[in-house]
């Protein structure tokens, strides 16, 4: 993997900097590095493809070295270099796609394609110019079974989940009380509602709670907490739990009371915030518990009182809600990230070349299914293909 990264970094620099008119002295170190790459690769043959619709291609390396000059690089010099650069880039692209297409239930962190296995050999260790990539560093740690430390801006750690729970219900569905939520990516929205606006509740207060277990622990998280759940702020028709009917939800939004958010790790509370909105910090957690209340307003203008009568029919439904967004966090497992294209790159390659469903990844790289059942085997393979995708993205956009 280090060799693949070094090759890609060298080729990217060569493509960007070896241009007509450039002073040789400004790129002499890069050209020496480029020549070292050619010397090491010359005389070797590789094969890529042969899985799904990814065609088999054979690669032979027999290229001349780039020479020295006292002046600027001329058109002939650059054209000669371009021929070599484009061949190498095409090779790297195909090695990456071949690797992305493959998976293994055992030791999925290790190279799976024939070409990358060959590049991992001792004879190519001389191609090791720059391994400063975060993904390379973490791939090495994962490969040695050390703790990795991925920093994500918005980690897609929450499988998609959208449902409701009714704490009070009738066959007519005309006086309901409960919670509804949607969890996805890095955001939780939860709403508590009561058709009667807590009229018959103790002290006219309804208590709601929403617990969200994560598939992996997060540390040093920056989180936004808002006293609203905008996805549940408009009328909708909802299928009943048994699927036999539908019921009408027509929310009127109140501000939640006594809001508390707890961040737990292995069942122990690590951080607690009460009635604090905006930006909050969570140190270390694998579970989020949100609790809040709907309080019937003790004083109401006639217009508000008409919204919340003391007896049916209840046309409008009192609703309170919360939104919690994980803006950034550190995770010791590789995850899809809203700010990166790695999952999209991997999925696109596998779809474009009709890669058959293997023993590890779900069909279509379905992220909800993948993260819901996030096994060590999936984590290893995802670490490898994301690393390769990050390398490929240096050359192929």
Swiss-Prot record:
This protein's record includes keyword Metal-binding: yes
Post-translational modification: The N-terminus is blocked. Sumoylated with SUMO1 and SUMO2. Sumoylation of viral proteins seems to have a positive role on viral replication.
MF terms (GO), sorted A to Z: host cell surface receptor binding; metal ion binding; structural molecule activity
A Pfam family of this chain: Rota_Capsid_VP6
Disulphide bridges, residue numbers: none
Region (Interaction with the inner capsid protein VP2): 62-73
Protein localization: Virion
Binding site for Ca(2+): 266, 286
GO cellular component: viral envelope; viral intermediate capsid
SUPFAM superfamilies linked to this entry: A virus capsid protein alpha-helical domain, Viral protein domain
Misc. comment: The VP6 trimer contains a zinc ion located at the center of the molecule. The zinc ion is not essential for either trimerization or transcription activity of the DLP. Zinc-depleted VP6 has an increased sensitivity to proteases.
UniProt record similarity statement: Belongs to the rotavirus VP6 family.
Function text: Intermediate capsid protein that self assembles to form an icosahedral capsid with a T=13 symmetry, which consists of 230 trimers of VP6, with channels at each of its five-fold vertices. This capsid constitutes the middle concentric layer of the viral mature particle. The innermost VP2 capsid and the intermediate VP6 capsid remain intact following cell entry to protect the dsRNA from degradation and to prevent unfavorable antiviral responses in the host cell during all the replication cycle of the virus.
Name the record gives this protein: Intermediate capsid protein VP6
């Amino acid at each position: 993997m280090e060799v693949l990264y070094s090759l890609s970094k060298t080729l990217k620099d060569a493509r960007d900097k070896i241009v007509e008119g450039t002073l040789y002295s400004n790129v002499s170190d890069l050209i020496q590095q480029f020549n070292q790459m050619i010397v090491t690769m010359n005389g070797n043959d590789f094969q890529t493809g042969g899985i799904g619709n990814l065609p088999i291609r054979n690669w032979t390396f027999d290229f001349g070295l780039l020479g020295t000059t006292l002046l600027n690089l001329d058109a002939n010099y650059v054209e000669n270099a371009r021929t070599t650069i484009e061949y190498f880039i095409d090779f790297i692209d195909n090695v990456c796609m071949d690797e992305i297409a493959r998976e293994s239930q055992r030791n999925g962190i290790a190279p799976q394609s024939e070409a990358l296995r060959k590049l991992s050999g001792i004879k190519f260790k001389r191609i090791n110019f720059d391994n400063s990539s975060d993904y390379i560093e973490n791939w090495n740690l994962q490969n040695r079974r050390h703790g990795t430390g991925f920093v994500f801006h918005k980690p897609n750690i929450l499988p998609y989940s959208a449902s409701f729970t009714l704490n009070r219900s009738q066959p007519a569905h005309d006086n309901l009380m409960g919670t509804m939520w949607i969890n996805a990516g890095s955001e939780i929205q939860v709403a508590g509602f009561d058709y009667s606006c807590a009229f018959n509740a103790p002290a006219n207060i309804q208590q709601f709670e929403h617990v969200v277990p994560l598939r992996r622990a997060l540390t040093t998280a920056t989180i936004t907490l808002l006293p609203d759940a905008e996805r549940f702020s408009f009328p909708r028709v909802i299928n009943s739990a048994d699927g036999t009917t539908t019921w009408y939800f027509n929310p009127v939004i109140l501000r939640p009371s006594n809001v508390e958010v707890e961040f737990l790790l292995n069942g122990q509370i690590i951080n607690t915030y009460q009635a604090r909105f905006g930006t909050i910090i969570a140190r270390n957690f694998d579970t989020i518990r949100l609790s809040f209340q709907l309080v019937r307003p003790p004083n109401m203008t006639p217009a508000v009182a008409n919204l919340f009568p003391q007896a049916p029919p209840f046309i409008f439904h009192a609703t309170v809600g919360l939104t919690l967004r994980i803006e950034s966090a550190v995770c010791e497992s590789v995850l899809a990230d809203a700010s990166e294209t790695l999952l999209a790159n991997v999925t696109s390659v596998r779809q474009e070349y009709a890669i058959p469903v293997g023993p590890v990844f779900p069909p279509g790289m379905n992220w909800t299914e993948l993260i819901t059942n996030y096994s060590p085997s999936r984590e290893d393979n995802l670490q490898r293909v994301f690393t390769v995708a990050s390398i490929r993205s240096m050359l192929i956009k």
